[in-house]
C-alpha cells in the first residue's frame, strides 16, 4: 500500500536521536474522555469496545486531538487488554469500574491452557492502524502500542485492576514457574501483535509497562524487564513503507532501573514525573554508543489543572531539566520527546492542553536559538 509522504518527521527524528528544530510533543491518552468530541463519538458507539472495534470510530477518535492541537504524533486508539481478550479471557468494561476479565488466569491449568492468540481475532486493530495511517495523509507519524508482558499478566491474573497486586505477586513468589510460562506466552503474543501493527502501517511502536514499578528490585529485572527484552528481540525493524520503526519502552515507576533499561534493544525510554530528566540524560541519553536512548516524558499530568501561566512555567522546568537540545545535524546526540509522565486525566480542561502544546513548541524553539 503506498503511503503519503511524511510532512512532519520531528517525532521520528527525535526517536533516532537526530537534531530537530523543536522538541516534539504528544500525550499519552491524547484521544480520550477529556475531549467533548470523544465523549460524543463514544456515545454513538455505545461502549468502549464498540469504539475500539469499529475502524471508522477508532480512526475518528485517534484524529480528534490532532484537529485541536499541533501534536507531533498520533497514537492508535485501542486498549492494552485486547491481547488477553483474544486469548479468550472475556474482557468487559463496566461503567465506573474499568476493565474486567470473566475468566482470569488463576492456577496451573489456566496457565497451561494459554497460548499466543490467532492474530486474526485482532484484525479490527490492524484495520484501524491502516485506516488511521491513510487518514493522517502524512500529517504526523502513527504510533502503535501494546501493554508489556508483566502489565498484561497483572490484569490477567487479578481479573481487573488492583490496588495491592496480591494475586499476581502470590503467583510470582509461590509459583515462579507458572509466572515465567505466562510471561513467555505474553511476550510472544505482544511481539506478534506489534509486528502486525507495523505491517499495517505503524511508524513507531511503544510498550507500556504501566505496572513494572510495583515490583521489588530483582523481581523487576526477572519478571518485567527480561520479558520486555524478549518482545523487543522479536520485533521486525522496518515498516510497511520500508522505513525503520523506532521502539519506545515506558515503565511507570521505573526510574530506579534506568541503567538496566539502557541495555534494552530500543530507541526511546519513557519516564514518569518522579524521574530527574537531567540525571536520566546522563545515565541513558549521553554517549555515542548504540545503546544510548532518546528520552520521552515527563511532566506530571496534574500540572494540566493549573492555570495556563503555571503550565507554561512547568513546561519550562521540564525543558530546562533535560537541558540544551542536541543541535548537530551531522551526528546523533541526546534528544527529548515531550510527554506526560502518565496518561492524561479525563477531567483535564482541553484549553489547558492547548497551552501546554503551544508552550513546548515555542519554548523549545527559543532554547535552540539561545
Swiss-Prot record:
Q: In Gene Ontology terms, what is one molecular function of this protein?
A: uroporphyrinogen decarboxylase activity
Functional pathway:
Porphyrin-containing compound metabolism; protoporphyrin-IX biosynthesis; coproporphyrinogen-III from 5-aminolevulinate: step 4/4
List the residues marked with site Transition state stabilizer.
79
Lyase as a keyword of this entry, yes or no, is: yes
Q: Which residues form a coiled coil?
A: none
Ordered alphabetically, the record's keywords are: Cytoplasm, Decarboxylase, Lyase, Porphyrin biosynthesis
The record's principal subcellular location, in a coarse class, is cytoplasm
Highest taxon, organism lineage:
Bacteria
InterPro entries linked:
UROD/MetE-like_sf (IPR038071), Uroporphyrinogen_deCO2ase_HemE (IPR006361), Uroporphyrinogen_deCOase (IPR000257)
Its EC number is 4.1.1.37
> Where exactly are the transmembrane stretches of this chain?
none
Which residues are recorded as binding substrate?
A: 29-33, 79, 155, 210, 342
Q: Which HAMAP family match?
A: URO_D
Report quaternary structure and partners: Homodimer.
Q: What is this protein called?
A: Uroporphyrinogen decarboxylase
Record the organism: Variovorax paradoxus (strain S110)
- This protein's gene is called hemE
Amino acid at each position: 500500500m503506498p503511503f503519503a509522504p511524511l510532512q512532519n518527521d520531528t517525532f521520528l527524528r527525535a526517536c533516532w536521536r537526530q537534531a530537530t528544530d523543536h522538541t516534539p510533543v504528544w500525550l499519552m491518552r491524547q484521544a480520550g474522555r477529556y475531549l467533548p468530541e470523544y465523549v460524543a463519538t463514544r456515545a454513538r458507539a455505545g461502549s468502549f469496545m464498540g469504539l475500539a472495534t469499529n475502524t471508522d470510530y477508532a480512526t475518528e477518535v485517534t484524529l480528534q486531538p490532532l484537529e485541536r492541537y499541533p501534536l507531533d504524533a498520533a497514537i492508535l486508539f485501542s486498549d492494552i487488554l485486547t491481547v488477553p481478550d483474544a486469548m479468550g479471557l472475556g474482557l468487559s468494561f463496566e461503567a465506573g469500574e474499568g476493565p474486567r476479565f470473566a475468566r482470569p488466569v488463576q492456577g496451573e491449568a489456566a496457565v497451561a491452557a494459554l497460548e499466543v492468540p490467532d492474530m486474526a481475532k485482532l484484525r479490527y486493530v490492524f484495520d484501524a492502524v491502516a485506516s488511521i495511517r491513510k487518514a493522517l495523509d502524512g500529517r504526523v507519524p502513527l504510533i502503535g502500542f501494546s501493554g508489556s508482558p508483566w502489565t498484561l499478566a497483572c490484569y490477567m491474573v487479578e481479573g481487573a485492576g488492583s490496588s495491592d497486586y496480591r494475586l499476581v505477586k502470590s503467583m510470582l513468589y509461590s509459583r515462579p514457574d507458572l509466572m515465567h510460562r505466562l510471561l513467555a506466552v505474553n511476550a510472544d503474543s505482544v511481539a506478534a501483535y506489534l509486528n502486525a501493527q507495523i505491517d499495517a502501517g505503524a511508524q513507531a511502536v511503544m510498550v507500556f509497562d504501566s505496572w513494572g514499578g510495583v515490583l521489588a528490585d530483582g523481581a523487576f529485572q526477572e519478571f518485567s524487564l527480561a520479558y520486555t527484552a524478549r518482545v523487543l528481540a522479536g520485533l521486525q525493524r522496518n515498516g510497511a513503507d520500508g522505513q525503520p520503526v523506532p521502539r519506545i519502552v515506558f515503565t511507570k515507576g521505573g526510574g530506579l532501573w534506568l541503567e538496566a533499561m539502557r541495555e534494552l534493544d530500543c530507541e526511546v525510554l519513557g519516564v514518569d514525573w518522579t524521574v530527574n530528566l537531567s540525571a536520566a540524560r546522563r545515565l541513558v541519553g549521553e554517549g555515542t554508543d548504540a545503546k544510548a536512548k532518546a528520552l520521552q516524558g515527563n511532566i506530571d499530568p496534574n500540572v494540566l489543572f493549573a492555570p495556563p501561566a503555571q503550565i507554561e512555567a512547568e513546561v519550562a522546568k521540564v525543558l530546562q531539566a533535560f537541558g540544551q537540545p542536541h543541535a548537530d545535524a551531522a551526528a546523533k546526540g541526546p534528544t527529548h520527546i515531550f510527554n506526560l509522565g502518565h496518561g492524561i486525566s479525563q477531567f483535564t480542561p482541553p484549553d489547558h492542553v492547548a497551552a501546554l502544546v503551544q508552550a513546548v513548541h515555542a519554548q523549545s524553539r527559543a532554547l535552540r536559538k539561545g
